[in-house]
Amino acid sequence: METEFIYYRHTTPIGVRIEEITGYEQLSGPNWVAFAKQVFSENSKDGYRVIDHYDSGAPFLDGESSRISVSHTGHMLVVASLPKTPEVDLSIFNPRTALGVDVESSSREQVLKVRDRYLSDEELAIVPADDITANIIAWTSKEALYKAALIQGIDFRSRIRIKSLPNLNSNQTANAYVIDDDGNQIEFVLYSYESEGNIITLAISLKTATFKKRK
């Protein structure tokens, strides 16, 4: 049975705008992602928009000054965005525009087999070994923090650290930090929610400019 693309936009409790594209399951892989990005490009109040990438790989909207972060899995594409910040160079890290998003299927059991590779000993103690949901939240948190920090090649176990996990059943956030190349500890807030059988996690710094006051 053929399905249509579904476009959904909302603002999270931490003030990050989210755009989700799902559906059209008769297509898959890179072709699905390409069509989903086309749907994103066409759904804007300000006209057609194009996702491009800096040399670092970080995404941006051509001709716009809003930080974005992009992730996809299966039949879901997620684009997170912040308010316009024309005073900030989006090609490099700035705490005002620190943003990362990651999405993963809520049933992906493979994360249980590789948790030792990306979780520190302290993190392994707070993430139950047999809890798929907790491990997916931990994995998406690490990925979102990596995207927010804009530090290529950073070690996930030693320099991206989770203090606690967000709660999917409430608006409860969690805390984490990233150690930059100068040894500075950058504090982050994590927020996770579930949509269409997927877990989405956002990471922003304590100084990130958002669309509204955080709860």
Show the residue positions of the predicted features.
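Core catalytic alpha/beta fold that binds nucleotide/phospho-ligands
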Residues: 1-215
